[in-house]
């Protein structure tokens, strides 16, 4: 996916208060009764009132071609809530709605449009509260405590459908084919779209659309749907309904990056940090039985144990996957943390990244050239930095107004407590020694001759992930680092934002009147002993970056307060999330991958063994979305990410890239 800006909808409100697109000269919904039309055309056309009680799965997936004001989604959500209230014991428990929108409304226009339907206000207010910023790609919104999931894909639907991961094929139970009229917006109503709808439709899946245009009916038939006409709503004579009565062959565009889930719903997670905590919640929400094994005596004693950590995206003009992943991960993280029903110290005070030398300033200039939404990042001149941050630096930079800091240790502990209330079982001081397959399960051998058997296993134990035979060849490395805890001063107390330079400095935590400054960086090290050299270097880096700032020289590290941790990282700065790849089988099966691309087998992996690792120094930003991606994959549900970015998160990616070029691969 190429980077491009998302333009907001160009609309006006007519005399009836109905939003009208200036670009397409068409209304977003009927002036007469848009709500009843939605119920008739899309809910009735897909027979949802009948299908919900009979649905044999816990999740029902609906996809839509044009989100617009969200009327269809809100109406469906209301109907789904009414269904759940009337059928609390039904198999169907959750709703997943996927929609595409090229020109999203602003939050203000969305709220104005929603005033048309007071009866939808309880649902509309939740949507407005989480409405995402205009970034390309998928924005996942978790609504109604996770019972309703909305995937909003911003961009051109005909481009986006070709970039969806193969794992979404045959997942859609019902299609809402909506949008501006074909005569007004012919670019959307293409055979490419109809083919994509058929590819994504589950056998037995349905579709409904307000139009009865002949080319639409024929196009959908050519794609594989069985079509019929139905009486239209109100004054409209006819509309179209369809059903996918056949099972279409499944294409596989990049089998070497194929993601496989599990038919089982019982898992063990190995680790004790933020990755484990958030993944536990994501799996429990999907009905999994989850057990956590932590080698330590308490959670968050590893890399997730710091007092303060900065939350902001990692952006790069020259790395599309990195840019796409972290921008969407950051916005998801903010939505996720804001609705978490647990307390943890945090302050969304903003983060300012400073150009303290020529190289860092050039990097910031490149980031600012990407036409980023002001909600995500804005330029800040040197003379304005003091006003924004509270301290003088003599540097210009880039500010992330929705960034800030949080306490990872408190977050991890309290999320795990919440997960325990939802059924999570935790065993502390269980150090996993090895694991092996036994009777279609995984046998876990712990220190002290303890054993356990589980259907599915997720390795999320940070830098220790490569200590098993299945993972020893992974191209990850350890990074030891020390964060200094410094007492505040009158000048430091004025710091209003997190400062990032050749290190970082947080505003004081009201809980202890200390700041965090860090962190040292020792690649390949797992040493967690206090280092006086690192303590002094943390201070000196601050002074070197801001040599004219007297407040920097007054930073006091003499009390030797610090915390040392070890992170797990990769050379491309992206997490590793997905199936644990089988190194030996990969080398054998893909020995001639450069020549056999079209005939390549699916990626060799260990069955029911997954990993969640290499979060590096940005785990607070990446962990929430990674947990959602992995839980969705494991549950065989829609994944909130495009195929190319998902490939960049695949644990086998560094091997496959070399094999595709005919190059040799080395372990580690």
From Swiss-Prot:
Pfam families: DAO (PF01266), Methyltransf_30 (PF05430). Residues 270-668 are annotated as: FAD-dependent cmnm(5)s(2)U34 oxidoreductase. Its EC number is 2.1.1.61, 1.5.-.-. InterPro entries: FAD-dep_OxRdtase, FAD/NAD-bd_sf, MnmC-like_methylTransf, SAM-dependent_MTases_sf, tRNA_MAMT_biosynth_bifunc_MnmC, tRNA_MNMC2, tRNA_S-uridine_synth_MnmC_C. One of its GO terms (biological process) is methylation. GO terms for molecular function: flavin adenine dinucleotide binding; oxidoreductase activity, acting on the CH-NH group of donors; tRNA (5-methylaminomethyl-2-thiouridylate)(34)-methyltransferase activity. It is found in: Cytoplasm. It catalyses: 5-aminomethyl-2-thiouridine(34) in tRNA + S-adenosyl-L-methionine = 5-methylaminomethyl-2-thiouridine(34) in tRNA + S-adenosyl-L-homocysteine + H(+). One of its GO terms (cellular component) is cytoplasm. Its cofactor is FAD. The keyword Lyase does not apply. Keywords: Cytoplasm, FAD, Flavoprotein, Methyltransferase, Multifunctional enzyme, Oxidoreductase, S-adenosyl-L-methionine, Transferase, tRNA processing. The keyword Ribosomal protein does not apply. It comes from the Bacteria. Its main location: cytoplasm. Coiled coil: none annotated. Residues 1-245 are annotated as: tRNA (mnm(5)s(2)U34)-methyltransferase. HAMAP family: MnmC. PANTHER family: SARCOSINE DEHYDROGENASE-RELATED, TRNA 5-METHYLAMINOMETHYL-2-THIOURIDINE BIOSYNTHESIS BIFUNCTIONAL PROTEIN MNMC. In the N-terminal section; belongs to the methyltransferase superfamily. tRNA (mnm(5)s(2)U34)-methyltransferase family. Catalyzes the last two steps in the biosynthesis of 5-methylaminomethyl-2-thiouridine (mnm(5)s(2)U) at the wobble position (U34) in tRNA. Catalyzes the FAD-dependent demodification of cmnm(5)s(2)U34 to nm(5)s(2)U34, followed by the transfer of a methyl group from S-adenosyl-L-methionine to nm(5)s(2)U34, to form mnm(5)s(2)U34. This is tRNA 5-methylaminomethyl-2-thiouridine biosynthesis bifunctional protein MnmC. It comes from Shigella boydii serotype 18 (strain CDC 3083-94 / BS512). The gene is mnmC.
């Amino acid at each position: 996916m190429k980077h491009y800006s998302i333009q907001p909808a160009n609309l006006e409100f007519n005399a009836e208060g109905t939003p009208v697109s200036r670009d397409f000269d068409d209304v977003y919904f009927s002036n007469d009764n848009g709500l009843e039309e939605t119920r008739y055309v899309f809910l009735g056309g897909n027979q949802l009132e009948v299908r919900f009680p009979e649905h044999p799965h816990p999740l029902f997936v609906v996809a839509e071609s044009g989100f617009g004001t969200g009327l269809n989604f809100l109406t469906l959500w209301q109907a789904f809530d009414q269904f759940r209230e009337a059928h609390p014991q039904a198999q169907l428990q959750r709703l997943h709605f996927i929609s595409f929108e090229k020109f999203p409304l602003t939050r203000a226009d969305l709220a104005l449009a929603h005033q048309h339907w007071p009866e939808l206000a309880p649902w509309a207010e939740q949507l407005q509260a989480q409405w995402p910023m205009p970034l390309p790609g998928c924005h996942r919104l978790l609504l109604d405590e996770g019972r309703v999931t909305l995937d909003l894909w911003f961009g051109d639907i005909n481009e986006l459908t070709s970039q969806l991961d193969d794992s979404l094929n045959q997942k859609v139970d019902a299609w809402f084919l909506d949008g501006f009229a074909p005569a007004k917006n012919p670019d959307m109503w293409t055979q490419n779209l109809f083919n994509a709808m058929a590819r994504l439709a589950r056998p037995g899946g349905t579709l409904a659309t307000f139009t009865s245009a002949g080319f639409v009916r024929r196009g959908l038939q050519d794609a594989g749907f069985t079509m019929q006409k139905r009486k239209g709503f109100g004054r409209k004579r006819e509309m179209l309904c369809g059903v996918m009565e056949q099972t279409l062959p499944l294409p596989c565009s990049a089998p070497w990056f194929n993601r496989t889930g599990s038919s089982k719903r019982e898992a063990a997670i190995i680790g004790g940090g933020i990755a484990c905590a958030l993944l536990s919640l994501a799996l429990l929400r999907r009905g999994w039985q989850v057990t956590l094994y932590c080698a330590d005596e308490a959670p968050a004693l590893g890399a997730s144990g710091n007092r303060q950590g900065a939350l902001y995206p990692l952006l790069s003009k020259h790395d599309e996957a990195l840019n796409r992943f972290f921008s969407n991960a950051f916005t998801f993280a903010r939505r996720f943390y804001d609705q978490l029903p647990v307390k943890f110290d945090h302050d969304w005070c903003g983060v300012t990244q400073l150009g303290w030398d020529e190289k860092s300033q050039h990097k910031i200039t490149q980031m600012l050239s990407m036409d980023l939404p002001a909600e995500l990042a804005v330029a800040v001149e040197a003379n304005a930095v003091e006003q924004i941050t509270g301290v003088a630096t003599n540097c210009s930079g880039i500010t992330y107004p929705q960034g800030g800091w949080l306490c990872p240790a408190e977050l991890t502990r309290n999320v795990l407590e919440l997960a325990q209330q939802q059924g999570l079982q935790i065993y502390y001081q269980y150090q996993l020694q090895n694991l092996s397959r036994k009777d279609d399960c995984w046998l876990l051998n712990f220190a002290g001759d303890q054993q356990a058997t589980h259907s599915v296993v997720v390795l999320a134990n940070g830098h220790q992930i490569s200590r098993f035979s299945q993972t020893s060849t992974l191209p990850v490395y350890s990074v030891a680092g020390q964060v200094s805890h410094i007492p505040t001063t009158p000048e430091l107390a004025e710091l209003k934002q997190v400062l990032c330079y050749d290190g970082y400095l947080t505003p004081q935590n009201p809980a202890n009147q200390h700041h965090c400054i860090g962190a040292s960086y020792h690649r390949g090290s797992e040493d967690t002993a206090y280092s006086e050299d690192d303590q002094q270097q943390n201070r000196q880096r601050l002074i070197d970056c801001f040599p004219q700032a007297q407040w920097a020289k007054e930073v006091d590290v003499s009390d030797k307060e610090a915390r040392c941790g070890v992170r797990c990282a990769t050379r491309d700065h992206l997490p590793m999330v997905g199936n644990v790849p089988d190194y030996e089988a990969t080398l054998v099966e893909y020995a001639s991958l450069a020549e056999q691309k079209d005939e390549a087998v699916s990626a060799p992996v260990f069955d029911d063994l997954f990993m969640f690792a290499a979060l590096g120094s940005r785990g607070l930003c990446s962990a929430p979305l990674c947990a959602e991606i992995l839980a969705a994959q494991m549950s065989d549900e829609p994944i909130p990410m495009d195929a190319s970015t998902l490939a960049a998160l695949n644990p086998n990616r560094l091997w496959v890239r070399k094999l595709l070029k005919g190059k040799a691969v080395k372990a580690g």
